[in-house]
């Protein structure tokens, strides 16, 4: 897997092409990713680079975390992320910035979707509602049957039912990088990405890139 970067969703806006076409874009702020550890096959069994972003007060860092950051000689961040590597070498303290990507490149963006709380099957799974009239009584939004009778005598795993919606890891694939603002550490990506404004997102080169 190719290395990516960790950023923060700043919100959405739009830009115009020279032809006057409006393109909706998500602005992602790419704070410099500080390398905290470089893992090798000899010592860890696989190749990977571990990074952190942002800052965290010393009172909010455990002793183990503080020692890990101190060993890498980097400031404590708000978390650690890891990217598998096939080639290339990094050292603790190296910086990875928005220049890793170029305009026109396709990327996959991973984030935590907005939590919707407890939701019914119509909202959560796009079920159709039942008849409003024609003898239907207080069953307008119920899901209906959830299985058979004595055989098999149970509800199959994975059955679509009411439950907690959102607040889960989501990846949107093959989004286009419209613009890279290296001076302000910004990526402008076409379309929407998962999560709320201010949430952490991971941007990687697309695994299904065309061409």
From Swiss-Prot:
MF GO annotations: rRNA binding; structural constituent of ribosome
Keyword Heme: no
Entry-linked InterPro entries: Ribosomal_uL3, Ribosomal_uL3_bac/org-type, Ribosomal_uL3_CS, Transl_B-barrel_sf
Modification N5-methylglutamine occurs at: 150
GO biological process, one term: translation
Keyword Ribosomal protein in record: yes
Keyword annotations: Methylation, Ribonucleoprotein, Ribosomal protein, RNA-binding, rRNA-binding
Post-translational modification: Methylated by PrmB.
Cellular component annotations (GO), alphabetically ordered: cytosolic large ribosomal subunit
Complexes and interactors: Part of the 50S ribosomal subunit. Forms a cluster with proteins L14 and L19.
Known role: One of the primary rRNA binding proteins, it binds directly near the 3'-end of the 23S rRNA, where it nucleates assembly of the 50S subunit.
PANTHER family, per database record: 50S RIBOSOMAL PROTEIN L3 (PTHR11229), LARGE RIBOSOMAL SUBUNIT PROTEIN UL3C (PTHR11229:SF16)
Protein name as annotated: Large ribosomal subunit protein uL3
Species assigned in the record: Pseudomonas entomophila (strain L48)
The gene coding this protein: rplC
